[in-house]
Structure formats: structure tokens, C-alpha cells
């Protein structure tokens, strides 16, 4: 959530930055007008309350003198009625103001590329060689079905579209991957967590999913309103919601593997086959809590942690800086890692690493006490390390052999009981 004081102090500058994120200036102008009206009413209300206190003192003095205080009582009743009316108007204005501000995305960092959509993203680097085949490479869904390790037909029967069963070596490969990822992040100082897979709506608000992206989630239809997590970012970030941390302990780094549940409301017709876009998938998440002056160094380190997984798996990838028009709601800067998918002859997103600066911390009230004892908002960061199903897809396609078998990457063989080939 943005700081209303910052908007007030630099309205035109903030409006220009938000315009690069698709926010119309009219919305900011409405917010600006409401803020002015709100401050005017606060001044008026405080003046009337001071007047009411003064009249109350007069009434007490008159009554002590056994005099007639009816005039003062009538005056106080009139002032009280005015205060009540102003406070009611103030409450309505604050509600309207809040409705606007909670829907505004984060301000982009100065290094974030300005652009309308993914076409304006900027490639930062490419790492690794894309494989060459002396045969036509198959898509991972065909490989998985032919090997009997991925079953979409029965997943669809049991649940519906965009669900599947992992079976045998497929299930073991999935498990091997997330155990490997967690072990690697543990070596980098991340504390491993097992989180709740359902959260309350305050938690969804804290990380910025609610209210703007409510349609993208699965929510329990009872009076509790719990939500199946779309990413472990939500419970991990909200772990410290409403708390003040010791600045000397920052940065704090968490990692967790969890299922992620997404309705994919706006994805009809996109990636209808395979592991790229599912309603339920496993993902290893990284979350950091950092001091503001250290957060961009921590973003580079987090991105390197995600890259480390791809490098050790021997997968070719590229790093892309997302444009203002393609970046997530809560992010100030985002790097996407895109892995090479041979059957599609392109790179596909497998990780997204973001610095949210104090945007989530303000929504969730996560603060720290610095060395001078001052309490201030910290910065939050999150990143995939990695999306497990998409990593399975990348391994199946990049390590396929002409006979349809899959060579297991060497780094994963200890996690798969020494298995060298899936056939």
C-alpha cells in the first residue's frame, strides 16, 4: 500500500509513475480531492471539539454558581450535533479514500523498464547452451504420458481440467526436485518452514492479493472465509504481520515448499496442456525481510539463489527485467527467470523474484527497530526457487532421448535412489 503522505507531497511525480502501471490520473485526482476534504474536516472537527470542551467548562462554572446554564447547554448540544455530522462525513470520506488507495499498485523502482506489457521487458542475460537434438523433441506432456509418469486423463476424471496425477518416477522426480531446492536454499542461510496451506483474508490483504485479485483464488464458502494459498509468499510474509522486529537480525530469510492453488480466471485457452499452468502445483518459495538500504542487494542475491538451482540442473535460461506494465501488483522491481522449453522453442517463466520495498510491510504492518531505537517499515522480497512442476517440464524436455526415455540430471540422482534414466 502506498503512503498517502508521499502522494500528497509529490502528486504529479507519483501520478506519472503510476501512469506507467496503467493507473489513470483521474483516480489519483479523486484521491487527492478526498484527502484535502478529509484534512479540512479533521481541522473543523477538532476546532468544534475544543469549543465543546470550552462550553462544558462554562456549564460547570455556571452550575457551581447555582446559575442558569440552559443557554450553554443548548450551545453544547448544537456543537455536539455538528461534530456528529462531521465525523459521519469524515468516516465516509476515509472509507472512499481507503477503497482507492488499497487498489493502487506499488511504485516502480527507477531501474524498472517502463513499458505497457511483456513486450517491453528487458533481457538482462542468458546462461547456458540450449540443447540440440538429432530428432524432433517431444512436448513434456507427451513424454510423461508415454512413460506412464504423468496422468492428465485421470486427473481430469477425479477433479477436472488443469489437474493431474504424478506417478512412479514422475512423483519421485517432483519430490527429488523440491527436496534438492530446499537443501540448496538451506545452504544459503534460508530457514526452512512448513506453512499453513490456508490463510485468512487479512493475510491475503497483507501481501496484496486481496481485494484486487480475489477472483484468482479459491476461497472457502463459510463464515471463516479461509483461502487456499496461491503461493507460500502469503503465509511466509504474514508470519511477522503486526510485529516489530529487531533490526540487528535483518535480513531474515525463509524458504518453504507448498502446494499453490490458483483459479487461473484470466487464462482460458492458454497453456491448456502440460505442467505450465495448473490449478494446483508445488512451488518452493523464498521470502526475505530486509532493511530498506539493503533490499536491492538482497534482490540480486535472491535472484542468484534461484539461478543456482537452474545452473546445477544444467538448464539453459535467461533473466528478464519486467516492465512497469507487466510487473506484479506489489512489486517495485522484478526479475523473471525463464527456462528453455525445446518443444515450444522458447523460454518460459520458471521463477519471479521481486522487491516489494515497504508496500507489503505497510499493508501488513511489519516494522523493525533500528540502531537508534526508531521504529520504521522494513522491505519485503519474494521469489520462486523454483516452480516445481515447470522444472519437471523443463527436465523432461531438455533431457529427453530419442527413444523417449529421460536422462536424470546428475545432481538429482542421489535424491532418486541412484536412478540414471527414466524409461
UniProtKB/Swiss-Prot annotation:
It catalyses: tRNA(Ser) + L-serine + ATP = L-seryl-tRNA(Ser) + AMP + diphosphate + H(+); tRNA(Sec) + L-serine + ATP = L-seryl-tRNA(Sec) + AMP + diphosphate + H(+). It is an enzyme of class 6 (ligase). PROSITE patterns: AA_TRNA_LIGASE_II. Its EC number is 6.1.1.11. Coiled coil: none annotated. Pathway: Aminoacyl-tRNA biosynthesis; selenocysteinyl-tRNA(Sec) biosynthesis; L-seryl-tRNA(Sec) from L-serine and tRNA(Sec): step 1/1. Homodimer. The tRNA molecule binds across the dimer. Belongs to the class-II aminoacyl-tRNA synthetase family. Type-1 seryl-tRNA synthetase subfamily. Consists of two distinct domains, a catalytic core and a N-terminal extension that is involved in tRNA binding. This is Serine--tRNA ligase. The gene is serS.
Amino acid at each position: 500500500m502506498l503512503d498517502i503522505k508521499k502522494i500528497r507531497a509529490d502528486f504529479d511525480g507519483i501520478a506519472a509513475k503510476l501512469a506507467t502501471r496503467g493507473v489513470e490520473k483521474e483516480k489519483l485526482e479523486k484521491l487527492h480531492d478526498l484527502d484535502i476534504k478529509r484534512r479540512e474536516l479533521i481541522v473543523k472537527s477538532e476546532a468544534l471539539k475544543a469549543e465543546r470542551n470550552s462550553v462544558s467548562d462554562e456549564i460547570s462554572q455556571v452550575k457551581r454558581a447555582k446559575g442558569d446554564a440552559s443557554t450553554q447547554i443548548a450551545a453544547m448540544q448544537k456543537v455536539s450535533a455538528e461534530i456528529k455530522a462531521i465525523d459521519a462525513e469524515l468516516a465516509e470520506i476515509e472509507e472512499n479514500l481507503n477503497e482507492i488507495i488499497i487498489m493502487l499498485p506499488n511504485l516502480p523502482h527507477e531501474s524498472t523498464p517502463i513499458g505497457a506489457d511483456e513486450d517491453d521487458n528487458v533481457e538482462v542475460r542468458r546462461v547456458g547452451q540450449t540443447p540440440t537434438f538429432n530428432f524432433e523433441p517431444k512436448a513434456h506432456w507427451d513424454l510423461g504420458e508415454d512413460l506412464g509418469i504423468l496422468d492428465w486423463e485421470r486427473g481430469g476424471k477425479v477433479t477436472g481440467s488443469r489437474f493431474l496425477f504424478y506417478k512412479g518416477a514422475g512423483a519421485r522426480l517432483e519430490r527429488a526436485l523440491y527436496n534438492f531446492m530446499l537443501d540448496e536454499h538451506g545452504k544459503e542461510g534460508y530457514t526452512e518452514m512448513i506453512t499453513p496451506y490456508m490463510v485468512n483474508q487479512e493475510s491475503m490483504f497483507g501481501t496484496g492479493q486481496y481485494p484486487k485479485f480475489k477472483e484468482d483464488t479459491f476461497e472457502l464458502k463459510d463464515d471463516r472465509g479461509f483461502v487456499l494459498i496461491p503461493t507460500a509468499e502469503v503465509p511466509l510474509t504474514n508470519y511477522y504481520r503486526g510485529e516489530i522486529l529487531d533490526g540487528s537480525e535483518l535480513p531474515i530469510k525463509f524458504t518453504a515448499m507448498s502446494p499453490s492453488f490458483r483459479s487461473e480466471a484470466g487464462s482460458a485457452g492458454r497453456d491448456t496442456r502440460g505442467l505450465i499452468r495448473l490449478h494446483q502445483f508445488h512451488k518452493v518459495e523464498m521470502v526475505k525481510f530486509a532493511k530498506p538500504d539493503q533490499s536491492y542487494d538482497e534482490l540480486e542475491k535472491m535472484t542468484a539463489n534461484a539461478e543456482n538451482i537452474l545452473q546445477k540442473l544444467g538448464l539453459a535460461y535467461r533473466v528478464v527485467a519486467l516492465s512497469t506494465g507487466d510487473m506484479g501488483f506489489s512489486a517495485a522491481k522484478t526479475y523473471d527467470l525463464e527456462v528453455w522449453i525445446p518443444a515450444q522453442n522458447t523460454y518460459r517463466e520458471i521463477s519471479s523474484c521481486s522487491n516489494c520495498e515497504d508496500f507489503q510491510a505497510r499493508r501488513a504492518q511489519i516494522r523493525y527497530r533500528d540502531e537508534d531505537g526508531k521504529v520504521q517499515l522494513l522491505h519485503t522480497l519474494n521469489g520462486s526457487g523454483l516452480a516445481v512442476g515447470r522444472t519437471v517440464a523443463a527436465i523432461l524436455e531438455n533431457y529427453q532421448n530419442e527413444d523417449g526415455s529421460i536422462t536424470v540430471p546428475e545432481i538429482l540422482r542421489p535424491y532418486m535412489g541412484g536412478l540414471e534414466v527414466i524409461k
